[in-house]
Design a protein with these regions (language model features):
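N-terminal secretory targeting modules
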Residues: 1-50, 54-62, 73-78, 112, ...
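Alpha-helical cap/lid subdomain in secreted, periplasmic
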Residues: 5-9, 101-243
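Conserved SGNH/GDSL esterase-like catalytic core that processes O-acyl groups on lipids
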Residues: 45-48, 54-139
């Protein structure tokens, strides 16, 4: 009887250790959908980074320190409080299976009361079955941007084009991993540039930054690696500091 109990205890302990290791692996590689939110101190400039898995940091090694919003916070320094509101797999367009505006991070980003919004959505909109057309995309784009302006009329808005996506080998399908279509991402980037210009919004051209750097991406050719995340963070930091 004692031997049986000992075996059960050892087995239970082994299961706990395995589950803990799995959790740590997912968390530290940006695969857990958990957040490391902190509370800003008085006087800090609040920066909300809104986006999808590229903002969240999908696949980033040592995710808590190396996702692009975390790196951005390190670059900007103690005078800024940067919060990651990226949600993996979400779209900008509202009439899809996973619109960003239906998720908890969207509501949290509004409640955060940011002084600066860094906005990067559009990659997941490029997939078959989600993409309608550029006009529908921009209509929804303007609607969500306006929701932040309504929440804080004085908010500084910085729009980002989505990162480039790369083909690996056969291009006949027109898609890369996750069903992402590089041709549509290119069109989305063009439309966001035009929208930013027409509406006098500041722009960070992440597409332009990344289009000649496939080495900045993970094996899936969609998500920036640690190097890519750092490059994005530096570009955003330069925009924030050099208004």
């Amino acid at each position: 009887m004692k031997k049986t109990k000992k075996i059960i205890a050892i087995s239970a302990g082994f299961v706990v250790v395995v589950l803990l290791l799995v959790f740590l692996y997912l968390y530290y590689n940006g695969l857990s959908d958990l957040y490391a939110h902190t509370v800003p101190t008085e006087g800090q400039i609040k920066v909300a980074c809104v986006g999808d898995s590229i903002t969240y940091g999908h696949g980033i090694t040592n995710w808590p320190k190396n996702n692009y919003p975390a790196v951005l916070g390190s670059i900007l320094g103690n005078g800024y409080h940067v919060q990651n509101f990226g949600q993996r797999g979400t779209t900008l367009q509202k009439d899809t299976d996973r619109p960003y505006t239906k998720g908890k991070p969207y509501a949290q980003s509004l409640e955060y009361g940011a002084d600066i919004l860094v906005f990067m959505l559009g990659t997941n909109d490029s997939t078959t079955g989600r993409w309608i057309d550029a006009e529908a995309f921009i209509a929804d784009y303007e609607e969500i941007i306006n929701s932040y302006k309504e929440s804080n009329p004085d908010i500084r808005i910085i729009l980002c084009t989505p990162a480039c996506a790369f083909f690996d080998g056969n291009q006949n399908s027109g898609k890369t991993d996750f069903g992402i279509r590089p041709s549509i991402i290119k069109e989305i980037a063009t439309r966001i540039r035009s929208f930013a210009l027409a509406k006098s919004y500041e722009l960070v051209d992440v597409y332009d930054l990344t289009q000649n750097h496939p080495e900045w991406f993970e094996a899936d050719n969609v998500h920036p690696s640690n190097d890519g995340a750092r490059a994005i963070a530096q570009l955003v930091a330069d925009k924030i500091k050099n208004k």
